[in-house]
C-alpha cells in the first residue's frame, strides 16, 4: 500500500488541465439544447398535443392515450436529431441517487424488419423491479412489480445517447417508493393552502408556486489518491488520518483563486449543465482546502430538485474525465469544514408576488408579515420533523461542529424585523381596535421595506435564516436529495397555513373584521413562536443552554432524530396533509433507519479491515526496525551511553505496542458489538444498537491510528495523508 501511495503522488505530479472548448461563444446558442422544452414541443408536436402537455402541466388535466402517442412520437423525433438510441424512465428511489434502465427504440415489425418505435404507453408508464430498491418492507422479493409514471411538469432531456424521462416511482399497490411523488403532493398542498390565505388579501391570486435555489458544496480529490484510500472509496469519508499542519486556519481558500485543473472541470460541468437547461451561475472555492461550491439561479422546486440530482450525476461523470473523484459526503475529512447543501426556499404567486419579500404598500406588507409569521410558527411546531428530514449518518458529523448549523432548529430574522413583530404584539389587543390604532399599525407595517433594505444581516450559524426575500435552510447535507427537506417544509407550511386560515375564519364568523382577525391570530402566533427566534451565535454553549430553557429540542442521536418522522405532530402534517399514508410513512422511517444502520456497518467493517490488515502490520514492521536498531546500538555503545541514547526509542516501542494492542482489542470488541446488533430483528433496535454500541468504536480506533501515523516513518505509511489529499492540486 505504501508503494501505491507514492505511485499516486508521482502520477499526480504529471496531471495537466484539460482543454475545454465551448460549443459557441453565445450561451443562448446551446442553452437547453438537450431539453425537450416548450420551444422544442412547439416545433415537434401537433398543436393539440402541445396544448395537452401545457394543460397537464398547468391545470393537471390528464393526457389521453391518443395524445400520449403523438407526444411520444414528437419526443422521439426530437431525440433522434441528437443521435439518441435509447430511452429511460429516470426516477429517484430512496437511495439518495437516481435510477434508470435503458431500453432501445428497436422493435421488430410484422414482416420481421427492424423498426424504431416509441409509443405513448412506453412514455407514460414502465415496470421496474420494486423489490430491488429501498421499500421499507412494502415489496417482498417475490412481489417485484412497481411502476414508473411520467412527470409531465419536468421536461425530458438527453444525456449522451439516452432520452431521459423524469418519472415518479410507485409500488404495484400504489405506495410511493421515491422522493418525487411526495414532493409533488407537498407542493400541491402548499399551493392550495397558501392560495386560500392569499385570497384574504387579493382575490386575483389563484396559484402559489414553490421556488428552490440549492447551493451544492463538494470536495475534489485526485483519482490516484482516491484509489489509494479504501475508506474514501468504500464509505465516502476518511475513517483515519491525522490533521495536516496547515488546513483552513489561514482562511486563504474561501473565494481564493481556483486551481487550473479544477477550473477546467468546472467549465466542462457548466457547459453540460447549460445544455440540459440547468441555470448554474456561481462557482467558487469553499472554506476547506479542495472544497468548492456550485449554485444555480432558483427554479420551480420540482424542477430544481431534478436538476440537483442530475448535476450530482454529471459531476461524478465529468470529474472522472479530469482525473478527479467528487466527494459528496458531509464530512470526508476530520478537522476541516464539511459540506452542506443550502436550500433557499420561497413562495411566489401567479401574479408575480414573492410572499417572502415586503410589499410596496401596507396591504402588501400585511401579506408578507402573514407568511413570515406562519413560517415562524411552522418551524416552531415542526422542529423535530425538519431535523428528521436532514438527519443522516454523514450529516450528523457536520451538524453542531462549529462549521454548520447546530441540531437545534431556530430562525434568524434580524433585529429590526424582530422588533417589528414585537411591536405588533404590543399594539394589538383583544379589544376592538379603533380606526386610529389600525392606521398607526399599518403605517408601521408600511416601513418594513425601509427597515429590511440595510438591516437584514446574515447569520451563518442559523439553520433557518431569513435573507431578505427567502428562507435559507442550511442544515441539509451535501449528499442528500433536496426533496427530503422540501417535503417536510412544504407539508408543514401547508398544515400551518390551513390552521391559520381556519382561525381567522372562526373570528370572522364571530363578527370580527377581517384585518383585525388577521392581526389577532398573527399576534397569537408571534407570541407562541417566540422561542424559535434567535439572533445570536448558534455555535455557542450558551445557546444550547438557552435553547433547553426555551423548550427547543437538540437531538444529535441519529436514530432518535429519525424516529420523529412518526411522532404525533409529524403524522398530523404528513398524513393529515395526505403527503403519505400510514404504510408509506412507516416505510420512510424503516428505510432511513436501515440506511443509517448499513452505513455505520460498512464504516465499521472497512475500518476493522484497514486497522488489522494495513495499519497494524506496518506498525509492527516499524517496531521491529526500532528493535533491530536497539540491538545494533547495544553492540556499539557502552552500557551507560546506550541507556541514555536508547531511552526515546524504547519509549516509542512501548507507545507503538500500546497502540497496536489497543487497536486489536477495540476492533475485536467492535466486531462483537456488530454481531450482537446484527442479531436484532427489529430495524429500530438494530439502528439504536449501531448508534450506541458500534459507532463509538470508530472514533476510539481512529484516535490510536492517528497517533501511530505521527510516530511511524513517513516512507512506509500505507495511506495518503491529509496534507496530500487536501493540498495537492
Curated annotation (Swiss-Prot):
Mg(2+) 2 binds at residues 217, 286, 293. Pfam families: Gln-synt_C (PF00120), Gln-synt_C-ter (PF18318), GSIII_N (PF12437). Mg(2+) 1 binds at residues 215, 342. SUPFAM superfamilies: Glutamine synthetase/guanido kinase. Inhibited by L-histidine (46%), L-arginine (38%) and L-methionine-DL-sulphoximine. The activity of this enzyme is not controlled by adenylation. Residues 85-174 form the GS beta-grasp domain. Its main location: cytoplasm. Its cofactor is Mg(2+). One of its GO terms (molecular function) is metal ion binding. InterPro entries: Gln-synt_C (IPR040577), Gln_synt_N (IPR008147), Gln_synth/guanido_kin_cat_dom (IPR014746), Gln_synth_cat_dom (IPR008146), Gln_synth_gly_rich_site (IPR027303), GS_Type-3 (IPR052725), GSIII_N (IPR022147). Disulfide bonds: none annotated. It comes from the Bacteria. One of its GO terms (biological process) is glutamine biosynthetic process. It catalyses: L-glutamate + NH4(+) + ATP = L-glutamine + ADP + phosphate + H(+). SMART domains: Gln-synt_C. GO terms for cellular component: cytoplasm. Residues 179-615 form the GS catalytic domain. Catalyzes the ATP-dependent biosynthesis of glutamine from glutamate and ammonia. This is Glutamine synthetase.
